[in-house]
From Swiss-Prot:
PANTHER family: ENDOTHELIAL DIFFERENTIATION-RELATED FACTOR 1, ENDOTHELIAL DIFFERENTIATION-RELATED FACTOR 1 MULTIPROTEIN BRIDGING FACTOR 1. This is Multiprotein-bridging factor 1. Pfam families: HTH_3, MBF1. SUPFAM superfamilies: lambda repressor-like DNA-binding domains (SSF47413). It comes from the Eukaryota.
Amino acid sequence: MSAWDTDAVKIGKNVSRGGAGPRETVVRGKSALNAAQRSGNIIATEKKYAAGNTASKPGVEGQRLTMVDRSDDIVKPKTVSKEVGAAIQKARSAIMIGDKAMTQKELATRCNSTQAIIAQYERGEGVPDQKLLGNLERVLNVKLRGSDIGKPKFEKKEKK
């Protein structure tokens, strides 16, 4: 027998793996899952993130959720920075309603949110929501995203 055994070499796309071992299959339905469990096969479940309706939910973070799902250690959730919280506080206190500064509750009603979420954002603990950040930028006239956080969104025009 030579070093090059031509009988054992199989090249091509139609070459089967051989053996009668169990193949990997996708189970669709509860009855097929129960049958696989009864047979004693190894069952692995994987969640398919952002499958069909990604256009309707642009905020879905599929890659991050997969990374969180596969990691063994605790992954800290994304939050807004303390700098954003300080900018929100400063801009909110600068806006006067009557003779008092704007409260968190008044800001929340103008941004179509709750006072608790505004408080989380001001502490720097809130989960970033682009829609809410856009509303806050519009109401407070302050940039909360990008490089120049805290700067006025639209500069006041000087009167001539």
